[in-house]
Amino acid sequence: LGSEQVLVKAAGNAGYAYSAGMNQMATATDTNGNLILDGQMLVVGNWDANNDQINGSSNKAGTVCATMQNGVCIDAAKIKDFFIMANGTAVTSTATNGGYTTMSGTSMAAPVVTGAIAVLHQMWPHMKGKHLVQLVLVTGDKNITGYNENVHGQGLLDMDAATRPVGA
């Protein structure tokens, strides 16, 4: 993965309390404990903006752990550290017949985050991919009723906060 690239992955739509499978690449480490993807991956959950909650079919951030020691997770990074949500419910998109249709799912939310990364990179072309990821994560809106990092990860994508100059 090039230093300016960011991998954005839909969390999945099985309604699981965790995101696993390929999503675990966000937290995969080498033998020295370094993130293989160098923090350049985001896992995206489906926020239902109409009902102001994570969509019931969206996989959640969860508590998947690769390394347990004495019953305690000792992973340096967890999926919830790379999990962000964006609206993916009732999104109008193109249909296979050439028209338009309304769809919902994490595959509708992931392009929103991809677009956000593109806008941020356009604003600050000097930033590396891992820094763009961190910007999205640290500016995530956690002002969510019943916020739980194991469900909501780092919160809801907040482009207003992400596009503000640091310190403003």
Question: What is the role of each PLM region?
Answer:
Residues 1, 111, 118, 138-139:
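P-loop NTPase catalytic cores that bind/hydrolyze ATP
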Residues 2-6, 39:
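A short helix->loop->beta-strand "cap" motif at the edges of active sites that frequently abuts
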Residues 8-12, 44:
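Active-site neighborhood of phospho(di)ester-bond hydrolases with catalytic His/Asp-centered motifs
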Residues 19-25:
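Metal-dependent catalytic neighborhoods of phosphoester/phosphodiester hydrolases
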Residues 28-122, 126:
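Extracellular S/T/G-rich loop segment that most often corresponds to the catalytic His/Ser-adjacent loop
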Residues 40-43, 122-168:
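C-terminal subdomain of the subtilisin-like protease fold in secreted/lumenal serine endopeptidases
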